[in-house]
Amino acid sequence: MQSQKIRIRLKAYDHKLLDVSVTEIVDTAKRTGARVAGPIPLPTVINKYCVLRGPHVDKKSRDQFEIRTHKRLIDILDPTQQTVDALMKLDLAAGVDVEIKL
């Protein structure tokens, strides 16, 4: 598995939960002897929704809601078999979406 790269992309609505998951992944990778590049913060996607307050008329009265999606990128360079096994066994929080590319 030499001269390979594992790219891990994490997404979450809560940035604190995301940072905890990132530190767990980085610590696990460093413990098994792999080099780690990152975490690299990617741009936060902000989705804004505008909703009418009242059920009938009065379009001037509105509420605005937003959802922020935070993203991080981690590159694991020269992973060993122990690194891959440790990452597979790692239990991350439920609110974090993980995408892995080899």
Swiss-Prot record:
GO terms for molecular function: structural constituent of ribosome; tRNA binding. Involved in the binding of tRNA to the ribosomes. Transmembrane segments: none annotated. PANTHER family: 30S RIBOSOMAL PROTEIN S10 FAMILY MEMBER (PTHR11700). It comes from Pelobacter propionicus (strain DSM 2379 / NBRC 103807 / OttBd1). It holds the Pfam family Ribosomal_S10. Part of the 30S ribosomal subunit. Keywords: Ribonucleoprotein, Ribosomal protein. HAMAP family: Ribosomal_uS10 (MF_00508). This is Small ribosomal subunit protein uS10. InterPro entries: Ribosomal_uS10, Ribosomal_uS10_CS, Ribosomal_uS10_dom, Ribosomal_uS10_dom_sf. Belongs to the universal ribosomal protein uS10 family. The keyword Nucleotide-binding does not apply. One of its GO terms (cellular component) is ribosome. The gene is rpsJ. GO terms for biological process: translation.
